[in-house]
C-alpha cells in the first residue's frame, strides 16, 4: 500500500478537526481535460494492474483458508489482535490482507458466502479510493463489506451510500451479523426517522444511507452549526458554545463507499440539492387557477416555445403581448409584468411538461414527486418557484406553502469533500473521463467470476406505441409458455399500469412494482424468478435488484428481460438487462421500443420523422438500422446532459465565490 494511502488512514492525523472534510478546489478547463484523459487511459490499462491485485487476492484466500480451522473464540481473538495492530501501524498492505482474510472467513460462517477472488480485488480497489466496475450480479454488496470493515476497524466512520431505501435496509440487515462479530455497530438512515435516531445511526461505525438523505443531513449540519459563516466567526462561536459538532448528524466526511456510483455521481448530478423553508405565498389558489385558464388560450410556436429536455417553456413576444392584453385589469401579481409572465410559464410547464403518473403521482390527495432514476416516490420533496403549487391546483389538491432556498449544494461539490471516496458500479466505462475529471476517481474494470451466459435477442423499434405493446405481449406469452420468468421494464408509472391493464385483458397473471404499488416490493422481487412469473416494473426493479431463480429455471433459459423504452444513457439500459444472467446463470434480454418514445422525440426527432415517413421501412426497424438509430439518440442525449453537468459545476463555483465574498457558505 502506498505511503499516501497509509497516511490517509492514520487516525491521529485526522482527529483534531471538529468536522473533517476535504477543502474545496476549483479546477480549470486544463485540469478537467487532463483528468478525463488520464481516467480513460487508466481504464484502458486496467488489465496491467490486475496481475498485482490477483496476487493480493491469492494471499487473502490462502490466509482465509488457514483461518477456517479456528474456533469462534480463536477467530474473535484474531480480531482483537488486529485492532491493536491497526491502532499502532495503520492499514499497511499486510494488515489489509489480514482484515480481508478475517472478513472472508466470518462472511462464510455468518452468511454462508465467501468472497470470490474478483470480489477481493474489488474491495481492494475501493479501499484505494477508486471505482470498481463490477458486472451486475457479481456481489457488490458483499464486496463493500471488505473496505468498510477495514476502515471502521481503524477507528474511522464509514458511509455506505446507495440509491434507495430498499437497498439500505436489505444490505444493512443482511450484513449486520458480520459487522457485529468484529465489534462494529451498523446504522441505517432511512426516511421519517426522528432526529435523535438519525444521529445515532450516523454515530455508528458503519452507516448505510441513501445519497439524497446523506446530502440533506450534511446541509442541515451546516445550517445548524453556522458553518456557512467565515472561519473566524466559527472560531469565536465555538468559544462561547463549546463543541459545534455535538448536535451534528454527521461526524465528518471520512470514507464514503458509493454503490451504483455512476447513478449517484453522474445521472443525479444535474441539479443542486436544496433545503428550503416555508414562506407566505403572495399568490393564492385563484391566481394559480387563472394562470392555468389563461395558458389554455396560448398556442405552441406562436405564443410560447417548449424546451422539453430542459423542462422549460418561454413566452414569445407575441405571447407576452397576449397575456398583457387579457390580464391588464386584474389586480395584484398580474400588474407586475415579470411576475405575471413567470406565473404563466409555470402554468404552461405544469400543463405540458409535468405529467401525472410519470413525473409525479397523486397519493393521499397530495402531489408526490417520482424520482426519475429510481422510480420511487420522494414524499418530502417539492418543486420550487411555485411550480409545485401550480401542479397541486391543476390536480385539485390542497395548496401547500411555497419554499424559499436557505442552503444548497451540488453532488459534485459534496462528494469531493470526502477525505477518501471509493465505489462500485456495473456501468462506468462510458463516463470514466467525467468521473476522473470531476471526482478524481479512477475506474478499474473487474473480470466476472464466471462466464456471462446472458443472451441479447436484439432490438425492435416500432413506428408507433400500440405496435410496441402488441409485440411486448407476444414476447411475454412466448417466454411464459417456456416456463421462464419474465421482467418487463417501463419508464413511468403510467406505462407500467397501461401494460398491466393489457395483461389483465389477455388473462395473464402478473405483478407490478411502481411508485404507487410499492408496499410488497420485497415479496414481488423474491417471487420474480419463479417458473412462468411475469413482473412489470419501473426503474424500481433496476439497480441493485437481485432476482434469484427458482430451481430448474436456469436450465429452461433463465430470466428474460424486456426493455420497453430506452433511457437517455445505455448505462441505465444495461442495468435492467443485468437483472438476467447473474452469477453465471442463463438469461436473455431484448428491447422492444417505439419511435414515439421520449428519447427519440427529444434527441432524434428529425431522423425519427424521416424514418417514419420513409415507405421503404416496414412497421418495425431491426438490426443495424435500429442500432444506429438508438446510438445516435443516446449519444445526443449523453452529450446534452454532460454539458448540463459541466454548467452545473461552473455555476456552483461562481456562486461559491460570490457567497464567500459575502462571508457565507452554501
UniProtKB/Swiss-Prot annotation:
**Which GO terms are recorded in the biological process aspect for this UniProt protein?**
intracellular protein transmembrane transport; protein import; protein targeting; protein transport by the Sec complex
Q: What is its main location?
A: membrane
A Pfam family annotated for this chain is SecA_DEAD
Q: How does it sit in the membrane?
A: Peripheral membrane protein
Q: Which SMART domains match?
A: SecA_DEAD, SecA_PP_bind
Reactions catalysed, semicolon-separated, are:
ATP + H2O + cellular proteinSide 1 = ADP + phosphate + cellular proteinSide 2
A Gene Ontology molecular-function term? protein-exporting ATPase activity
Known EC number: 7.4.2.8
Alphabetical list of SUPFAM superfamilies matching this protein: P-loop containing nucleoside triphosphate hydrolases, Pre-protein crosslinking domain of SecA
> What Gene3D superfamilies does the record tag this protein with?
P-loop containing nucleotide triphosphate hydrolases (3.40.50.300), SecA, preprotein cross-linking domain (3.90.1440.10)
Residues the record lists as binding ATP: 119, 137-141, 546
Q: Which GO terms describe its cellular component?
A: cell envelope Sec protein transport complex; cytosol; plasma membrane
UniProt entry keywords in alphabetical sequence? ATP-binding, Cell inner membrane, Cell membrane, Cytoplasm, Membrane, Nucleotide-binding, Protein transport, Translocase, Translocation, Transport
What top-level branch of life does the organism fall under?
Bacteria
Q: Which CDD domains match?
A: DEXDc_SecA, SF2_C_secA
Family indicated by similarity:
Belongs to the SecA family.
Known function: Part of the Sec protein translocase complex. Interacts with the SecYEG preprotein conducting channel. Has a central role in coupling the hydrolysis of ATP to the transfer of proteins into and across the cell membrane, serving both as a receptor for the preprotein-SecB complex and as an ATP-driven molecular motor driving the stepwise translocation of polypeptide chains across the membrane.
Official protein name in the record: Protein translocase subunit SecA 2
Upper lineage: Bacteria, Pseudomonadati, Pseudomonadota, Betaproteobacteria, Nitrosomonadales
- The UniProt gene name for this protein comes to secA2
Amino acid at each position: 500500500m502506498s505511503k499516501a494511502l497509509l497516511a490517509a488512514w492514520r487516525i491521529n492525523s485526522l482527529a483534531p478537526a471538529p468536522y473533517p472534510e476535504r477543502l474545496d478546489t476549483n479546477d480549470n478547463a486544463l485540469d478537467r481535460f487532463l483528468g478525463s484523459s488520464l481516467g480513460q487511459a487508466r481504464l484502458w490499462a486496467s488489465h496491467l494492474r490486475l496481475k498485482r491485485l490477483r496476487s493480493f487476492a491469492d494471499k487473502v484466500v490462502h490466509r482465509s483458508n488457514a483461518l477456517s480451522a479456528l474456533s469462534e473464540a480463536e477467530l474473535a481473538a484474531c480480531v482483537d489482535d488486529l485492532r491493536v495492530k491497526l491502532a499502532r501501524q495503520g492499514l499497511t498492505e499486510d494488515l489489509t490482507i489480514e482484515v480481508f482474510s478475517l472478513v472472508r472467513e466470518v462472511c462464510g460462517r455468518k452468511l454462508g458466502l465467501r468472497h470470490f477472488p474478483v470480489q477481493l480485488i474489488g474491495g481492494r480497489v475501493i479501499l484505494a479510493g477508486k471505482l470498481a466496475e463490477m458486472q451486475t450480479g457479481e456481489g457488490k454488496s458483499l464486496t463493500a463489506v471488505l473496505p468498510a470493515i477495514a476502515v471502521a476497524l481503524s477507528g474511522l466512520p464509514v458511509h455506505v451510500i446507495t440509491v434507495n431505501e430498499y437497498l439500505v435496509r436489505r444490505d444493512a440487515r443482511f450484513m449486520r451479523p458480520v459487522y457485529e462479530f468484529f465489534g462494529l455497530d451498523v446504522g441505517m438512515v432511512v426516511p421519517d426517522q426522528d432526529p435523535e435516531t438519525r444521529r445515532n445511526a450516523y454515530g455508528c461505525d458503519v452507516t448505510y444511507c441513501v445519497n439524497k438523505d446523506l446530502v440533506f443531513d450534511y446541509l442541515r449540519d451546516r445550517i445548524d452549526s453556522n458553518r456557512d459563516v467565515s472561519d473566524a466567526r466559527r472560531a469565536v462561536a465555538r468559544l462561547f458554545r463549546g463543541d459545534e459538532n455535538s448536535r451534528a448528524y454527521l461526524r465528518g466526511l471520512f470514507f464514503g463507499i458509493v454503490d451504483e456510483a455512476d447513478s449517484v455521481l453522474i445521472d443525479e448530478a444535474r441539479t443542486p440539492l436544496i433545503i428550503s423553508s416555508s414562506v407566505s405565498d403572495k399568490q393564492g389558489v385563484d391566481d394559480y387557477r387563472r394562470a392555468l385558464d389563461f395558458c389554455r388560450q396560448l398556442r405552441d410556436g406562436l405564443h410560447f416555445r417548449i424546451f422539453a429536455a430542459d423542462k422549460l417553456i418561454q413566452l414569445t413576444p407575441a405571447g407576452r403581448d397576449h397575456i398583457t392584453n387579457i390580464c391588464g385589469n386584474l389586480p395584484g401579481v398580474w400588474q407586475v409584468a415579470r411576475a405575471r409572465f413567470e406565473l404563466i410559464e409555470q402554468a404552461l410547464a405544469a400543463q405540458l411538461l409535468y405529467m401525472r403518473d410519470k413525473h409525479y403521482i397523486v397519493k393521499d390527495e397530495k402531489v408526490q414527486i417520482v424520482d426519475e432514476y429510481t422510480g420511487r416516490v420522494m414524499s418530502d420533496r417539492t418543486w420550487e418557484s411555485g411550480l409545485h403549487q401550480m401542479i397541486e391546483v391543476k390536480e385539485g389538491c390542497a395548496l401547500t406553502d411555497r419554499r424559499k432556498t436557505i442552503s444548497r449544494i451540488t453532488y459534485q461539490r459534496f462528494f469531493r469533500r470526502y477525505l477518501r471516496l471509493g465505489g462500485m458500479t456495473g456501468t462506468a466505462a462510458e463516463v470514466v473521463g467525467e468521473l476522473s475529471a470531476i471526482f478524481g476517481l479512477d475506474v478499474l474494470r473487474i473480470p466476472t467470476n464466471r462466464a456471462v451466459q446472458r443472451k441479447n435477442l436484439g432490438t425492435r423499434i416500432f413506428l408507433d406505441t400500440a405496435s410496441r405493446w402488441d409485440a411486448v405481449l407476444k414476447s411475454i406469452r412466448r417466454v411464459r409458455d417456456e416456463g421462464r420468468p419474465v421482467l418487463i421494464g417501463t419508464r413511468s408509472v403510467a406505462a407500467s399500469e397501461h401494460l398491466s391493464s393489457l395483461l389483465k385483458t389477455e388473462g395473464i397473471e402478473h405483478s407490478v412494482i411502481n411508485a404507487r404499488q410499492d408496499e410488497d416490493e420485497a415479496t414481488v422481487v423474491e417471487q420474480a424468478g419463479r417458473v412462468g412469473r411475469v413482473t412489470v416494473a419501473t426503474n424500481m426493479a433496476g439497480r441493485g435488484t437481485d432476482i434469484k431463480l427458482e430451481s430448474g429455471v436456469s436450465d429452461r433459459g433463465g430470466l428474460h428481460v424486456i426493455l420497453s423504452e430506452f433511457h437517455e444513457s445505455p448505462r441505465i439500459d444495461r442495468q435492467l438487462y443485468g437483472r438476467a444472467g447473474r452469477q453465471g446463470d442463463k438469461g436473455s434480454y431484448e428491447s422492444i421500443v417505439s419511435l414515439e418514445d421520449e428519447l427519440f422525440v427529444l434527441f432524434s426527432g428529425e431522423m425519427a420523422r424521416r424514418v417514419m415517413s420513409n415507405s421503404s421501412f416496414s412497421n418495425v426497424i431491426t438490426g443495424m438500422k435500429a442500432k444506429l438509430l438508438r446510438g445516435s439518440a443516446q449519444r445526443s442525449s449523453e452529450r446534452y446532459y454532460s454539458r448540463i453537468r459541466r454548467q452545473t459545476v461552473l455555476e456552483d463555483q461562481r456562486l461559491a465565490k460570490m457567497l464567500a465574498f459575502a462571508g457565507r457558505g452554501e
